């Protein structure tokens, strides 16, 4: 039995989340509302929302937790060639926070194999856009010839980044944005990107599961660190990161 949260109710302890033997491992609580303040409280406690359209807001704390350390991002030989083209061709741009809401909409509407519908409803977009206006939510966008062709968004607290979703309208466009994010965050002292749930795709990019207790210990320290200011990106950041990756 999970807890139902009224607007001012605190989250239950995360060790009350449903266990691996249940049909919904990691499910902790449900609520009717998704406010910006509730989101900030959740992320600081290692809790994230994920639900289908028409359901109440479902709150999760999975164990283990999928994370990506920026230095562990895997760059294949083929993708390394792609990054070189992006770096050398001025038609390719990496922008941060240029089109946050539009990036969320693209994440919601881009078709994905095996996925029907989206949890990124208009209410979700409004809540995260409010966080963006307050400096907590950010987008990393891949542009080509003036067109946004891929990107991702997530939430930053201190030196902790919580990835939410990504999209691509061109091959590797979301992967380029993720590489740029890793390059930027690595340079800012961010040691861990929260990827929430384990998938084969994330594992192929270098993501790995960690025990929830270890994840929460890291969140408590990293999320209380000074915020990253400013969020600014140019290709030199990605170029230096790519060179270091080649030498590793």
Curated annotation (Swiss-Prot):
Where is it mainly found? cytoplasm
Keywords linked to the UniProt accession: Acyltransferase, Cytoplasm, Transferase
Q: Which reaction does it catalyse?
A: N-terminal L-lysyl-[protein] + L-leucyl-tRNA(Leu) = N-terminal L-leucyl-L-lysyl-[protein] + tRNA(Leu) + H(+); N-terminal L-arginyl-[protein] + L-leucyl-tRNA(Leu) = N-terminal L-leucyl-L-arginyl-[protein] + tRNA(Leu) + H(+); L-phenylalanyl-tRNA(Phe) + an N-terminal L-alpha-aminoacyl-[protein] = an N-terminal L-phenylalanyl-L-alpha-aminoacyl-[protein] + tRNA(Phe)
Q: Supply one GO CC term from the record.
A: cytoplasm
E.C. number: 2.3.2.6
This entry's Gene Ontology molecular function terms read: leucyl-tRNA--protein transferase activity
EC primary class: transferase
GO biological process terms on file: protein catabolic process
Q: Pfam families, from UniProt?
A: Leu_Phe_trans (PF03588)
InterPro entries xref list: Acyl_CoA_acyltransferase, Leu/Phe-tRNA_Trfase, Leu/Phe-tRNA_Trfase_C, Leu/Phe-tRNA_Trfase_N
Say yes or no: keyword Acyltransferase present. yes
Where is this gene product found?
Cytoplasm
Q: Which family does it belong to?
A: Belongs to the L/F-transferase family.
**Function summary:** Functions in the N-end rule pathway of protein degradation where it conjugates Leu, Phe and, less efficiently, Met from aminoacyl-tRNAs to the N-termini of proteins containing an N-terminal arginine or lysine.
- What name goes with this protein? Leucyl/phenylalanyl-tRNA--protein transferase
Q: Which species does this protein come from?
A: Ralstonia pickettii (strain 12J)
* UniProt gene name: aat
């Amino acid at each position: 039995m999970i807890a139902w949260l009224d607007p001012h109710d605190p989250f239950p302890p995360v060790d009350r989340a449903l266990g691996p033997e249940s049909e919904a491992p990691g499910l902790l609580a449900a609520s009717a509302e998704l406010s910006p303040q509730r989101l900030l409280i959740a992320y600081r406690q290692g809790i994230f929302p994920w639900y289908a359209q028409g359901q109440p807001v479902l709150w999760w704390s999975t164990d283990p937790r999928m994370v990506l350390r920026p230095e562990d991002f895997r760059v294949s030989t083929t993708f390394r060639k792609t990054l070189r083209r992006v770096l050398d061709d001025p038609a390719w741009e990496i922008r941060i926070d240029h089109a946050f809401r539009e990036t969320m909409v693209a994440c919601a509407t881009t078709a994905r194999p095996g996925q029907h519908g989206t949890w990124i409803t208009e209410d979700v977009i409004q809540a995260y856009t409010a966080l963006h206006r307050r400096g907590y939510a950010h987008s990393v966008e891949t542009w080509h010839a003036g067109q946004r062709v891929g990107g991702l968004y997530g939430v930053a607290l201190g030196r902790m980044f919580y990835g939410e979703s990504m999209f691509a309208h061109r091959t590797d466009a979301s992967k380029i944005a993720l590489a740029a994010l890793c390059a930027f965050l690595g340079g800012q002292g961010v040691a861990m990107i929260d990827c929430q749930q384990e998938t084969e795709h994330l594992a192929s990019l270098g993501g790995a599961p960690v025990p929830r207790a270890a994840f929460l210990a890291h969140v408590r320290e990293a999320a209380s660190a000074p915020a990253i200011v400013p969020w600014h990106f140019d290709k030199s950041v990605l170029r230096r990161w790519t060179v270091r990756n080649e030498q590793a």
